[in-house]
Every structure is written in C-alpha cells, then in structure tokens.
C-alpha cells in the first residue's frame, strides 16, 4: 500500500463500482476512513474525498445523474487528494 502524496497517510484499498455516467467511471467508499473515491472517465486518476459520510456514497449510487450529484453535493464540500493507483 502506498501513501497519499500530501499527507503521507496510507491510501486505503477501496472496492470500486462502475456507474452509468458521461463523466464518472467508478465510485467506491471506505467506511472506516470515510473516504469517497471517484474515478473520472477523462483521466487515469482517482480522487479521494475525505470525511464524507456514507450517505453521500449511497445517494450518489442511487442518483439519476452521478455527474450532477457530484457537482452539487460533493465538489467543493470535502478536502480531497488526487492519486494514481
């Protein structure tokens, strides 16, 4: 397991679930660390959003538009780090 570039903390292993979306490829959640991971289709990079309550993952998975949910509910709301896995 590697570490986050900024904080140096270990990067958790997170199971990813492919989603139907024009921009988002997959989403995953690690409940112990409250980390929401999102992989966008346009990049081979993952974004980990920290201290995200599990409800955000559940609601995102249920949402009709994953991209709209991300833009209105997640983007700008949580600290994040870009990682390459």
Question: What is the predicted function of each stretch?
Answer:
Residues 2-85:
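Acidic/histidine-enriched, beta-strand-rich ligand/metal-binding domains
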């Amino acid at each position: 397991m590697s570490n986050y570039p900024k904080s140096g903390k270990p990067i958790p292993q997170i199971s990813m679930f492919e989603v139907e979306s024009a921009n988002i490829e997959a989403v995953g959640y690690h409940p112990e660390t409250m980390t929401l991971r999102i992989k966008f289709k346009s990049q081979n990079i993952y974004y980990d959003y920290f201290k995200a309550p599990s409800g955000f993952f559940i609601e995102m998975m249920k949402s009709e538009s994953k991209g709209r949910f991300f833009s209105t509910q997640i983007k700008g709301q949580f600290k994040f780090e870009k990682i390459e896995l």
